[in-house]
């Protein structure tokens, strides 16, 4: 079987390859089958994709006894042509493949950048490489999804602003509050809980377990049923949200709480978060309620009731001190005041102050929350407020820059004054040297000097080495 190749170059680095195959094999003559010429046409472009067609030419009337049919320039009497498409190039599919490849490369680069600029500064230098290696090996998919998700990517960018701040942990938690979604949760579950790529923050003893005597000895969990507001909180990271309305009910021997609260946005708006927590009572210490066995970060919260007053009155309250732990942080904590009223009753403050002292806290440091739960401001108002705050921020930064410039000018002025003073002092020293020089001249030398009426420099030139070397000072 003869096979020849002919290439035709087209525009834009495209080429057309023609493969011509002639039926010169003797088997075709003996078989009596209709001979067929096959031409393969392959179009190749510079993007590496091909479009191939096969052209069949069948001879209906021809004599195969003549070997001239096997020549390159055969005369064809009657040709029946048909096309068979082998592979069709889909432009959309090709572009999709290219974009997918570029997107994968972008994601890989973004992962490396996240490791370099976000994760590494957040952990100790010893653990930095281990953390990045673990994420790239164990949580590559979750990290790629995070970078591709706007909220999760914004969370990563927000975390970058927390590096090396005094309130670094609190800043990181606020970032999570603002940008939390399912993608963020999946990344945290892999990096923190499942693969433990991120080191756990140790307990520093800020919120220790309270003394048993500081906890109420008798408490009925059924008294917690109904709606309660958190009207005051100790920890600004966990306790001081607006519109904290929690509704509790009993399920068998467990207390179930449906918790809702608001997260403020940067433009003055808000969005509402919610969670469900289940508590069991400590049989040996009724004032202790435990919320364990949670899937998300395996967090565990222990509540200790320091004081309570439940008489179905507007000033009913429950003073809760809590501490907790999860896969990311061991030993976080805080304290909240639950009241039936959306505002803190003044009449219960003395009781709260006494209870706060029992755990070494000052109730004056608690933060009053806003439970008015009003509607979200209109978008125009929020934009105006944001613009005003931005203007205030610019003015503040301009004032700070001006103050820094003034300080630099003062430093330069002080430097110039110091230099001038040193020059003046040096000039005085030269005058003193000159006076000492003249004073120590001998009588004969002074007479000669007076006669010559020379200056000190001229005297030095005149006498040269003849003048006695003396220590003038």
Curated annotation (Swiss-Prot):
GO cellular component terms, A-Z: chloroplast thylakoid membrane
Signal peptide segment: none
Gene Ontology molecular function, alphabetical: violaxanthin de-epoxidase activity
pH-dependence annotation: Optimum pH is 5.0.
Gene Ontology biological process: xanthophyll cycle
Subcellular location per the Swiss-Prot or TrEMBL entry: Plastid, Chloroplast thylakoid membrane
Reactions performed catalytically: all-trans-violaxanthin + 2 L-ascorbate = all-trans-zeaxanthin + 2 L-dehydroascorbate + 2 H2O; all-trans-violaxanthin + L-ascorbate = all-trans-antheraxanthin + L-dehydroascorbate + H2O; all-trans-antheraxanthin + L-ascorbate = all-trans-zeaxanthin + L-dehydroascorbate + H2O
Membrane topology qualifier: Peripheral membrane protein
Record keywords: Chloroplast, Coiled coil, Membrane, Oxidoreductase, Plastid, Thylakoid, Transit peptide
EC number of this enzyme: 1.23.5.1
InterPro entries: Calycin, Lipocalin_CS, VDE, VDE_dom
Activity regulation details: Inhibited by DTT.
Keyword Chloroplast: yes
Keyword Membrane: yes
Coiled-coil positions: 383-463
Main location: plastid
Taxonomic superkingdom: Eukaryota
Family listed: Belongs to the calycin superfamily. Lipocalin family.
Known function: Part of the xanthophyll (or violaxanthin) cycle for controlling the concentration of zeaxanthin in chloroplasts. Catalyzes the two-step mono de-epoxidation reaction. Stereospecific for all-trans xanthophylls. Zeaxanthin induces the dissipation of excitation energy in the chlorophyll of the light-harvesting protein complex of photosystem II.
Additional comment: Associates specifically at acidic pH with monogalactosyldiacylglyceride (MGDG), the major lipid of thylakoids.
Name of the featured protein: Violaxanthin de-epoxidase, chloroplastic
Origin organism lineage: Eukaryota, Viridiplantae, Streptophyta, Embryophyta, Tracheophyta
Gene: VDE1
């Amino acid at each position: 079987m003869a096979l020849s190749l002919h290439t035709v170059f087209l525009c834009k680095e495209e080429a057309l390859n023609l493969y011509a195959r002639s039926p010169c094999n003797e088997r075709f003559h003996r078989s009596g089958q209709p001979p067929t010429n096959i031409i393969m046409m392959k179009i190749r472009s510079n993007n590496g994709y091909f479009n191939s067609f096969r052209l069949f030419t069948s001879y209906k009337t021809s004599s195969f006894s003549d070997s001239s049919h096997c020549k390159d320039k055969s005369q064809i009497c009657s040709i029946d042509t048909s096309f068979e498409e082998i592979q069709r190039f889909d432009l959309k599919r090709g572009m999709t493949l290219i974009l997918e490849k570029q997107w994968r490369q972008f994601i890989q680069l973004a992962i490396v950048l996240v490791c370099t600029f976000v994760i590494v500064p957040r952990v100790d230098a010893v653990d930095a490489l281990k953390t990045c290696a673990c994420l790239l090996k164990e949580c590559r998919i979750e990290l790629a999804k995070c970078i591709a998700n706007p909220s999760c990517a914004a969370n990563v960018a927000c975390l970058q602003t927390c590096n090396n701040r005094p309130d670094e942990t609190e800043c990181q938690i606020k970032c999570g509050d603002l940008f939390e979604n399912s993608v963020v949760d999946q990344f945290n579950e892999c990096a923190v809980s499942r693969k433990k790529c991120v080191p756990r923050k140790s307990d520093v003893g800020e919120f220790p377990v309270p003394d048993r005597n500081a906890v109420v000895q008798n408490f009925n969990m059924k008294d917690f049923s109904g709606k309660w507001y958190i009207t005051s909180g100790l920890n600004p990271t966990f306790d001081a949200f607006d519109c904290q309305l929690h509704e509790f009910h009993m399920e068998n021997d467990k207390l179930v709480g449906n918790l809702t609260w608001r997260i403020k946005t940067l433009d003055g708006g808000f969005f509402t978060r919610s969670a469900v927590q289940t508590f069991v009572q400590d049989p040996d210490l009724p004032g202790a309620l435990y919320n364990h066995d949670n899937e998300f970060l395996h967090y565990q919260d222990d509540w200790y009731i320091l004081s309570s007053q439940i008489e179905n009155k507007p000033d009913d309250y429950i003073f809760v001190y809590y501490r907790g732990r999860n896969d990311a942080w061991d030993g976080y904590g805080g304290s909240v005041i639950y009241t039936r009223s959306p505002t803190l009753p003044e009449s219960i403050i003395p009781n709260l102050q006494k209870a706060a002292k029992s755990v070494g806290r000052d109730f004056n440091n608690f933060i009053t929350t806003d439970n008015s739960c009003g509607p979200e401001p209109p978008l125009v108002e929020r934009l105006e407020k944001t613009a005003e705050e931005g203007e205030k921020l610019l003015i503040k930064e301009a004032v700070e820059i001006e103050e820094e410039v003034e300080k630099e000018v003062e430093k330069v002025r002080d430097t110039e004054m110091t230099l001038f003073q040193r020059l003046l002092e040096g000039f005085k020293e030269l005058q003193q040297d000159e006076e000492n020089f003249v004073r120590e001249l001998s009588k004969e030398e002074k007479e000669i000097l007076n006669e010559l009426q020379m200056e000190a420099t001229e005297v030095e030139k005149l006498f040269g080495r003849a003048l006695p070397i003396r220590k003038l000072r």
